[in-house]
Every structure is written in C-alpha cells, then in structure tokens.
C-alpha cells in the first residue's frame, strides 16, 4: 500500500483513462514455506491518498480483509458527504 500513490501518479502521466487501484496489504509470501510474513498495512491510512493521486476505482487484492473493504466504503461515503461524485 505504501508505494501505490507514486505508482498511480506514474500511470497518470501516460493515460487519461480511469485508473484502477487494487493493492495487496504489503505482506510478502514465501513460496518455500507457503507462509505470509510482515505486518499488513491497513488501507484506512492510504485510501484518500490513492484517490488524490488519481485512482477512481479502488479495491483490494491479496490478503485484503473485510475491514479494508469497509475502510474503502467509508471513504466513498466521505466523498459523497463532501459532494464529490466518486467512481469507487
């Protein structure tokens, strides 16, 4: 999650199409032991940054939890309250 905003900004330089953001939680997978390691990073701290960087469809991939989905939905509700027509 911590690298997504800069990646979105890079993609925006090359397209005017809507950008989809579907990150994982920042953990790493060890295929030898078939285990995940590292601490998951909560989406709550990043969703607004991703949106402000240019993402218009935001979801979650590997290891994203119902709490992460809730955080995305809460941010969408904030945008609606602010009068911004979200595309999330």
Label each residue range with its predicted role.
Residues 1-88:
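Domain-level signal for soluble alpha/beta catalytic cores
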């Amino acid at each position: 999650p911590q690298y997504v905003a800069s990646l979105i900004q890079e993609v925006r330089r090359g397209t005017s199409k809507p950008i989809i953001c579907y990150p994982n939680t920042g953990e790493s997978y060890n295929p030898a032991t078939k285990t995940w390691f590292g601490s998951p990073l909560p989406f709550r701290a990043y969703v607004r940054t991703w949106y402000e960087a240019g993402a218009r469809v935001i979801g979650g991939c590997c290891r994203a939890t119902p709490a992460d989905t809730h955080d995305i939905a809460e941010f969408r509700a904030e945008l609606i309250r602010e009068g911004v027509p979200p595309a999330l």
